[in-house]
Structures are given as C-alpha cells and as structure tokens.
C-alpha cells in the first residue's frame, strides 16, 4: 500500500490537491458522503451542483440548466454501443496501445476524464488503471464504476480490469502502478486541450466538463514521468491541430478524422 493512499475495493484515493466548492442537497446523506469522501466543500454560490437521482451521480452547471448533466455510464448508452459495435481491436486506440494477437497490455490512463477511452481498452481485454486528479470527476468515475461492477453483463470483467486512482498524474503515476502491484506496459495520456476559437459546436457535455476542469496547462510535464513508468510505450491522444506534447516528436503517429495518437515506443510488444 502506498503511503497516503486509501484503497477501497478498486478505488485508490490520495488527499486531493484541488480545493473544490460544490452545491448539493445537504439533506441527502448520499451526497454528504460523496462530498466528505472526495474533500468537496459545500457552497450555496458554487457554479456546479452534484445530484443523485435514479442511482446515478450527475454534475450540473447551475447557470445553464438546459444543459444535460454529466455522469459516467459504462453500462448503457454510447459506450455500450461502442463496446458492441465499435470495431474491436481494429480501432485506432487499440492499435496505438499495441493490442494484437497474444498481446494485451496493462495500461495506466494518466488523464482519465470520464473514462471512455479507458473503458474501450478494458472491454478489449486490457487491465486499465485510471488516474484522475479532479475530485469531482473522480467522484463521477467512482459512481460509474460502482454501477458497472454491479452489472450482471460486464461486472465480472470490470472488477478485474478497471480501477481508479485519484491524484495528480505528474506526481502519482508511479504511485498508481505501485498500488496496483503490476508492471505497466503502456501509459495513455489525453490532456485537455483548448478548442479553437471557431469551434463553437463543441458538444454541450464537453463544454460543461471543460468549464469544470479547464485546460491541462501542465500537460507537457506528463511526458517525462510517463516515459519513465511505461515499459513498452507512451500513447498521447491529441487534436489534429495540436503540437507534439512537450515538443517531443513521437516514434509514429496514428491519425483519425479529428485526432491523432502520438506513439512513443520504448520496447517492442512481445506476445
């Protein structure tokens, strides 16, 4: 067990470095528990609200009530559709992390966000340790994992393959690996990158998410610790217009319609 880390099931929690004020119904014990667990401070003037309805924890931007709340759902909706019909190991992300016949790497997702890329990799057989530094996002991820672990269809392999570590990626990538007790083949990074000014059609959900967490202005500092941790490769997901992370040219690039995967190879993937 890593010093300063609480391990509860598959959730690893370090004291948050981000002080976050949030609004929630203080008469609701579930929300009180979430706030205490993740170090969230109640404020009646907070920009965001946490709600718990129909067994789902959601985040709402209070000054834009028409926007749909954000939650993490690994069981149904878009991620379930992608798991069933998304192209399997032929997907670009699978190629980027080195998934192939006889090779199923262990991955640290150093910038988990809402966990969608991590879930894709886990559904394809990878063991994935998600690292998320923002306490509100980590709370949403934990809630999504809770429901996924309980699901009759995916619960067994989700328990075995997906875990969450709360802490700053720059400081705690190695802590996450140590807590998991396994060698890390791949570190996957998808830092939040500012959208172009003309990009007015950013999905509403992403607008809410970005206004909560902001851009990862320290993203360049992720590459060095990621390279030190990964035994095989580091994969960085970038918008097609973004510069190389930390100005370092990747070994190879896998391009998609709007994004690209920059792959920094350290060693071959051997089955």
Curated annotation (Swiss-Prot):
Encoding gene (name): rsmJ
Pfam families linked to this entry: SAM_MT
Superkingdom classification of source: Bacteria
Keyword check for Transferase: yes
Enzyme class per UniProt: transferase
Annotated protein name in UniProt: Ribosomal RNA small subunit methyltransferase J
Entry's localization field: Cytoplasm
Keywords linked to the UniProt accession: Cytoplasm, Methyltransferase, rRNA processing, S-adenosyl-L-methionine, Transferase
The keyword rRNA processing belongs to this UniProt entry's keyword annotation: yes
Similarity comment: family membership: Belongs to the methyltransferase superfamily. RsmJ family.
């Amino acid at each position: 067990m890593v010093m300063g880390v609480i391990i509860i099931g598959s959730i690893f929690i370090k004291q948050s470095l981000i002080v976050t004020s949030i609004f929630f119904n203080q008469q609701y014990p579930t929300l009180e528990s979430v706030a205490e667990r993740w170090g969230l401070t109640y404020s009646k003037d907070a920009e965001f609200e946490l709600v718990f309805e129909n067994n789902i924890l959601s985040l709402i931007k209070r000054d834009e009530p028409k926007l749909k709340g954000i939650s993490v759902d690994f069981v149904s909706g878009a991620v379930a559709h992608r798991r069933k019909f998304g192209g399997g190991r032929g997907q670009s992300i699978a190629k980027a992390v080195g998934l192939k016949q006889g090779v199923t790497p262990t991955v640290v997702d150093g910038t988990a966000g809402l966990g969608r890329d991590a879930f894709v990799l886990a559904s394809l057989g990878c063991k994935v340790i998600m690292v998320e530094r923002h306490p509100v996002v980590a709370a949403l991820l934990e809630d999504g994992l809770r429901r996924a672990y309980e699901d009759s269809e995916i619960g067994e392999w989700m328990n075995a393959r997906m875990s969450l570590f709360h802490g700053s990626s720059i400081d705690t990538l190695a802590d996450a690996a140590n807590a998991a007790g396994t060698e890390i083949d791949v570190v996957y990074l998808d830092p939040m990158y500012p959208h172009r000014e003309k990009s007015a059609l950013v999905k509403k959900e992403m607008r809410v998410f970005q206004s909560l967490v902001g851009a990862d202005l320290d993203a360049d500092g992720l590459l060095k610790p990621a390279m030190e941790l990964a035994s095989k490769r580091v994969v960085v997901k970038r918008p097609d217009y973004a510069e190389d992370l930390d100005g370092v040219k990747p070994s190879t690039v896998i391009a998609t319609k709007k994004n690209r995967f920059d792959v920094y190879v350290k060693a071959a993937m051997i089955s």
